[in-house]
Amino acid sequence: MTIALGKFTKDQNDLFDIMDDWLRRDRFVFVGWSGLLLFPCAYFAVGGWFTGTTFVTSWYTHGLASSYLEGCNFLTAAVSTPANSLAHSLLLLWGPEAQGDFTRWCQLGGLWTFVALHGAFGLIGFMLRQFELARSVQLRPYNAIAFSGPIAVFVSVFLIYPLGQSGWFFAPSFGVAAIFRFILFFQGFHNWTLNPFHMMGVAGVLGAALLCAIHGATVENTLFEDGDGANTFRAFNPTQAEETYSMVTANRFWSQIFGVAFSNKRWLHFFMLFVPVTGLWMSALGVVGLALNLRAYDFVSQEIRAAEDPEFETFYTKNILLNEGIRAWMAAQDQPHENLIFPEEVLPRGNAL
């Protein structure tokens, strides 16, 4: 019996091999298979946002002006969510709502679902791009894993939260002032700042900023090979093989400052990865909870005592009153389709009003 060993070669490359060769070719901007998802979705999401903020009104969905054409600026323009009556419709251009009429589609808020869905898939494509490139150059995929944090936040806030509510109407509109309004809405209707998942998110993001600042400063402080350049950026060759800072010196410094310090670079950098990504994931989980209308902490005993004793008040009870004010003043303005009318005597009044 004879066994022939050799490399199997096909006489002619199939379509997959041809596409793979072109997509993964070494070029200035890597395309890759992930680029088939990333580039079209990112293009349509960004293009839809610029189109909406430039030309499209929110008069028919929110009773607002939201475009440059109507007099808004960069901070006040937005691509607004569809009307509440449209619930969770995908608002396809060719769907039963718009029936192929582009103007009507824009008036109904079709650009919001267009931007949100293409944006979500664009972010996923960017994460897949990091996976693909990491595999190509034989790196571990931690960059892609880290980027899952922002994706989780985007998907939870813009997609899962409104899916748990009555419609896309209650998602954030894509604009600076619109996001601020959404933050106030979250506080007034969900007491979001007292939610433990929000607390973990704040700790993660601000803790990561602190770690980043400390790490950068420590590396700069422990440089031990000065070059001939006029400053740090000119002094070193970006392709040099050897390190030019001292981990030992940094460890000694922080051991004296705190009593403890990282002695292992892998653990240090994993910690810098873990803190912000975990914070973002926790905040995303919290928003999923809000989609189901799960409540934050309720200190009912303090509320009862504050109601019975005029001299007893805590920062918590003051915040509860502020939330009531936000709801009462915001609901009528924010949800004009409900035709809410609150008599003056039930609207909260205080020093700030």
Curated annotation (Swiss-Prot):
Residue numbers carrying Phosphothreonine: 2
Classification via InterPro entries: D1/D2, Photo_II_D1/D2_sf, Photo_RC_L/M, Photo_RC_L/M_CS, PSII_PsbD/D2
Principal location class: plastid
Protein topology in the membrane: Multi-pass membrane protein
Cofactor binding, per record: The D1/D2 heterodimer binds P680, chlorophylls that are the primary electron donor of PSII, and subsequent electron acceptors. It shares a non-heme iron and each subunit binds pheophytin, quinone, additional chlorophylls, carotenoids and lipids. There is also a Cl(-1) ion associated with D1 and D2, which is required for oxygen evolution. The PSII complex binds additional chlorophylls, carotenoids and specific lipids.
Residue positions binding chlorophyll a PD2: 198
Binding site for chlorophyll a ChlzD2: 118
Catalytic reaction list: 2 a plastoquinone + 4 hnu + 2 H2O = 2 a plastoquinol + O2
Molecular function as annotated in GO: chlorophyll binding; electron transporter, transferring electrons within the cyclic electron transport pathway of photosynthesis activity; iron ion binding; oxygen evolving activity
Residues bound to Fe cation: 215, 269
N-acetylthreonine PTM sites in chain numbering: 2
Transmembrane residue ranges: 41-61, 125-141, 153-166, 208-228, 279-295
UniProt-annotated location(s): Plastid, Chloroplast thylakoid membrane
Keyword Transport: yes
E.C. number: 1.10.3.9
Positions bound to a plastoquinone: 215, 262
Note: 2 of the reaction center chlorophylls (ChlD1 and ChlD2) are entirely coordinated by water.
Family of the protein in this entry: Belongs to the reaction center PufL/M/PsbA/D family.
NCBIfam families, per the entry: psbD
Record-given protein name: Photosystem II D2 protein
Organism (species): Cicer arietinum (Chickpea)
